[in-house]
């Protein structure tokens, strides 16, 4: 019996920019040979808003409300790096209490970021149930932010040069501890539901593998880097804010696949809860209501009015000038290394403001990862990278 062999032509399809699995306005031009991906070209820029140029025409205080729109799932990290850049350039010291408040806000944001990654990632691979669970926990974090800053997801406008805008409100520390007590068992629930699920494991194990050398050469950061066997976390490396005061571990894996990236993020949420608990317990002056009571009892010359018990070093004037010089500042966000290169020329506006976003760099490896995989694995691999297009395009 003669066998007829057919040769198919490669097919080019567009995924996005409006597809729900694209995690924003990302367009992928995918070349397929049957079910196999031959090539993939990401098309970005649909959400470009000129954030760097806006920064060069605004004072720092005017610019802080803009920055929560870079990565709108990690507004606190954007605000932190925005004030850290002129702080380092002008050598401004931040009170210890303000540093502790900053760390609490950043770690709450890390949890919220990982939760917002977890739900859609699992929905991409076919697990719909956790998508609804994660919003329940995120709402509690937003309630805490609303009590402290007046806003929820974005526009917190909380970080300031030299500290934070206002102290934590009455009873906030207790509410935050209640959230920690509530959230820890929920992470265990996620693990029971997801980690050993055979369908989930089949979809993500061995898929989108990145070796240690590839992760370094492609300049990956955050969970993408740590899941490939590189134990690198800027909170440990750069010793910024007051992370050295706390007992916590860098979470990392060696497999480098989608499953390893999932494990790193799940464990990081536990570490964040651990850091928040220690920060609440060790905060100089304690809860706001206790600190105010001590100040009232001991009068104006009380030691509780010292520098380290303040929420801000000194309120910066609208005419604050960024000194001459240049500096690169970075921090560890939920997605990886967020950096700012700032160049000042003794003006109220920075002369140059360069943003280094984590997911822009992490997204570059996508065409390399997708070559040779099946169409169904595109969503799992893209979802495991964790991109927000507001941050990629800026």
UniProtKB/Swiss-Prot annotation:
Q: Which Pfam family, giving just one, matches this sequence?
A: Complex1_49kDa
Catalytic activity entry: a plastoquinone + NADH + (n+1) H(+)(in) = a plastoquinol + NAD(+) + n H(+)(out); a plastoquinone + NADPH + (n+1) H(+)(in) = a plastoquinol + NADP(+) + n H(+)(out)
Q: E.C. number, please? A: 7.1.1.-
Q: Which GO terms describe its molecular function?
A: NAD binding; oxidoreductase activity, acting on NAD(P)H, quinone or similar compound as acceptor; quinone binding
* GO BP terms: photosynthesis, light reaction
Its chief place of residence is membrane
Q: Where in the cell is it found?
A: Cellular thylakoid membrane
Query: What topology does it adopt in the membrane?
Result: Peripheral membrane protein
**Broad class of enzyme this protein falls into:** translocase
State if Ligase is listed as a keyword.
no
Cellular component, GO annotation: plasma membrane-derived thylakoid membrane
Keyword list (alphabetical) reads:
Membrane, NAD, NADP, Plastoquinone, Quinone, Thylakoid, Translocase, Transport
Q: What does this protein do?
A: NDH-1 shuttles electrons from an unknown electron donor, via FMN and iron-sulfur (Fe-S) centers, to quinones in the respiratory and/or the photosynthetic chain. The immediate electron acceptor for the enzyme in this species is believed to be plastoquinone. Couples the redox reaction to proton translocation, and thus conserves the redox energy in a proton gradient. Cyanobacterial NDH-1 also plays a role in inorganic carbon-concentration.
PANTHER family xrefs: NADH DEHYDROGENASE [UBIQUINONE] IRON-SULFUR PROTEIN 2, MITOCHONDRIAL (PTHR11993:SF10), NADH-UBIQUINONE OXIDOREDUCTASE 49 KDA SUBUNIT (PTHR11993)
The family annotation for this protein states: Belongs to the complex I 49 kDa subunit family.
The subunit structure is: NDH-1 can be composed of about 15 different subunits; different subcomplexes with different compositions have been identified which probably have different functions.
Q: What is this protein called?
A: NAD(P)H-quinone oxidoreductase subunit H
Organism listed in the record:
Picosynechococcus sp. (strain ATCC 27264 / PCC 7002 / PR-6)
Q: What is the lineage of its organism?
A: Bacteria, Bacillati, Cyanobacteriota, Cyanophyceae, Oscillatoriophycideae
